[in-house]
UniProtKB/Swiss-Prot annotation:
One of its GO terms (cellular component) is proton-transporting ATP synthase complex. Mitochondrial membrane ATP synthase (F(1)F(0) ATP synthase or Complex V) produces ATP from ADP in the presence of a proton gradient across the membrane which is generated by electron transport complexes of the respiratory chain. F-type ATPases consist of two structural domains, F(1) - containing the extramembraneous catalytic core and F(0) - containing the membrane proton channel, linked together by a central stalk and a peripheral stalk. During catalysis, ATP synthesis in the catalytic domain of F(1) is coupled via a rotary mechanism of the central stalk subunits to proton translocation. It holds the Pfam family WRW. The gene is ATPsynF. Keywords: ATP synthesis, CF(0), Hydrogen ion transport, Ion transport, Membrane, Mitochondrion, Transport. It is found in: Mitochondrion membrane. Belongs to the ATPase F chain family. This is Putative ATP synthase subunit f, mitochondrial. InterPro entries: F1F0-ATPsyn_F_prd (IPR019344). It comes from Drosophila melanogaster. It comes from the Eukaryota. One of its GO terms (biological process) is proton transmembrane transport. Transmembrane segments: none annotated.
Amino acid sequence: MAFGDYPAEYNPKVHGPYDPARFYGKADVPFGQVKLGEIGAWLGRRNKTPNAVAGAVSRAWWRWQHKYVFPKRAGIAPFFQLTVASMTFFYLINYTKLKHHRNYKYH
């Protein structure tokens, strides 16, 4: 699959218009319905390649956009969510520099 192609599992005659937020692979048991003894087998069935992880992140991004950004009367919530997420991300990547400041008596 090249960059910009549809997934191999997508069939326009069966699935209709393409939706980037939908997984077109074989359906599996949702994680919320997995029993404790089956978690290892469930994780073993996951596709852990970089392409699969990138596809999962892309689908999550599209689902978030469909829920918060694309509605006709979208509010200000997505902007606050992106702001908090970016603040958290930059705090985490700068934590190694910031953790030394808590021991300083005077700045």
